Design a protein with these regions (language model features):
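N-terminal glycine/threonine-rich, aromatic-flanked beta-hairpin/loop signature
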Residues: 55-124, 128
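Short hydrophobic/aromatic-rich beta-strand segments that constitute the beta-sheet cores
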Residues: 47, 76-85, 142, 161-164
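Edge beta-strand at a domain terminus
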Residues: 99-113, 127, 146-150, 156-225
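A composition-driven surface/loop motif
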Residues: 78, 131-133, 138-144, 152-154
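Bacterial N-terminal signal peptides that target proteins for export
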Residues: 4-15
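C-terminal motif of bacterial Sec signal peptides marking the signal peptidase cleavage site
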Residues: 25-28
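N-terminal helix-cap/turn-to-beta initiation motif at the start of protein domains
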Residues: 30-46
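N-terminal "first-domain core" detector
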Residues: 48-53
Length: 225
């Protein structure tokens, strides 16, 4: 009898284990299903496409763009977007762009340059209205007068947005204004130093540029207040 009772207990225990395993599997499946569902275009997004020697030569900056997309109705056919752009106002103490500052050096073998620059809000637009495409809800046609190809396209596979030739990713702890500003600073220094080296090597006599960079990111702290 004892042996029979023990067998029953073992079978009951095994049955309980099977039930628990089944529940865990179902929970996992539902979790994976939920995580694989499209999050949609709503939320805060950020984009930065890099700063190269060509930016230095052309004196054209590459801003960091922040985009905030909101649905304005339950059916999510109407959206509004707020957009901001930041870049470093890259000037010398004489308020000259880097490409012009080299022309002020003259024929010397060593030149010291000190660039003091601040991250600056250069563009802000609020409540840009857009309507979802009736055939593709992930495409939102933004109403921006005078600018063609302003469709905001959400890619559910990569959870990114394409808008105005920029690829936006969601803002998070590792992808935000501060982290991209840090990347911008590194790119700016590398590109500028490379350009100055090329200019210096082409000079007669050759000129070595010794450059100091000072960046002011106080606008980021001010935004957090």
């Amino acid at each position: 009898m004892r042996g029979t009772a023990m067998v029953k207990r073992i079978l009951q225990y095994l049955s309980l284990c099977i039930v628990l395993v089944s529940l865990f599997i179902l929970a996992g499946c539902s979790s994976n299903s939920a995580s694989s569902q499209s999050k949609g275009p709503e939320g805060e997004w950020i984009a930065y496409s890099g700063y190269t020697v060509q930016n230095v030569v052309s004196a054209v900056d590459t801003p960091i763009f922040i985009l905030n997309v909101k649905a304005r109705n339950d059916s999510k056919t109407i959206y509004t977007a707020d957009m901001k752009a930041y870049n470093y106002q890259y000037t010398t103490p004489e308020k000259r762009p880097v490409i012009e500052s080299t022309q002020m050096v003259g024929d010397i073998k060593e030149a010291r340059l000190n660039y003091i620059t601040a991250l600056t809000l250069v563009m802000s637009a609020n409540d840009i209205v857009g309507n979802a495409d009736s055939s593709n809800s992930n495409t939102i046609k933004m109403d921006i007068t005078g600018i063609p190809n302003t469709a905001l396209i959400y890619d559910s596979k990569t959870d990114t947005i394409k808008f105005m030739d920029q690829t936006f990713k969601r803002v998070n702890e590792t992808n935000n204004l501060q982290t991209l500003a840090d990347a911008y600073k590194k790119d700016l220094q590398v590109a500028s130093n490379k350009y100055l080296e090329e200019i210096g090597n082409a000079a007669n006599p050759k000129t070595k540029f010794i450059t100091t960079y000072n960046f002011d990111d106080s606008i980021i702290k001010d935004n957090k207040k």
